[in-house]
Amino acid sequence: MAELSTRYNLPTNITEKSINLDLNSTARWVKEPSVGGWTVKWGNFIFHIPNTGMTLLHHLKSNFVVPEWQQTRSLFSHLFKNPKSTIMEPFLALRILLGVALKDQELQQSLIPGFRSIVHMLSEWLLLEVTSAIHISPNLLGIYLTSDMFKILMAGVKNFFNKLFTLHVVNDHGKPSSIEIKLTGQQIIITRVNMGFLVEVRRIDIEPCCGETVLSESVVFGLVAEAVLREHSQIERGQPLNLTQYMNSKIAI
């Protein structure tokens, strides 16, 4: 007589026990000061953010710049010659970048509805708020953000970092250097520069007369140093460097 058997059953919850995932960590933004910058914890990431580039951005926005920097000011005139532009700190630029990474998953992948809702809430929170936490019902998290879904979400963020590293530094060879995304009421542009990634957020207004959308002159921008993302990317360390991709002496940042 044939009998039921559990001979090949997998051990129970081995992965979850060994990894010890904190699913609520996606709903918390922990920022702490460190030497020369900040440490940010979100999800299963720990980012070490230096205060790199802030002084340079403020110099470029002033009128007292060396002639070699004028080309950079002209190229990004809506940032450096615009009285309505504002410089944000690197940890806020990183927050915007992470919000875009989640939004990229939400828009491009076939996510199950409940999981998509959580990704949407998290991305909107990162993009539109500066609070340290967002309340998501524990029941909702338990049902739709399982340990497997958590891993998928974090892997998607790493894939977005990898996508950023395929960009070339701003160049005159026509090679792609930016990722752009339009959301409700705002446009976000992430551009690769010598020092890392320039993140800009522009509001989209609606003309009262005709209902057409136009980009507002108000823009907020900041710089995320390359090292912040590189330690979490999967770029092969031994791959040959493309100088167009990694450096351009014609731009100041």
Curated annotation (Swiss-Prot):
Keywords: Host cell membrane, Host membrane, Membrane, Viral matrix protein, Virion
Entries under InterPro entries matching the protein: Filo_VP24
GO-annotated biological processes: viral process
GO molecular function annotation: structural constituent of virion
Compartments where found: Virion membrane; Host cell membrane; Host endomembrane system
GO cellular component, one term: virion membrane
Any matching Pfam family: Filo_VP24
Source taxon at top rank: Viruses
Main localization (coarse): virion
Its membrane topology: Peripheral membrane protein
Function in brief: May act as a minor matrix protein that plays a role in assembly of viral nucleocapsid and virion budding. Unlike Ebola VP24, mVP24 has no measurable impact of host dendritic cell function.
Family listed: Belongs to the filoviridae membrane-associated protein VP24 family.
Assembly, per entry: Monomer or homotetramer (Potential). Interacts with the nucleoprotein.
Name by which UniProt lists this protein: Membrane-associated protein VP24
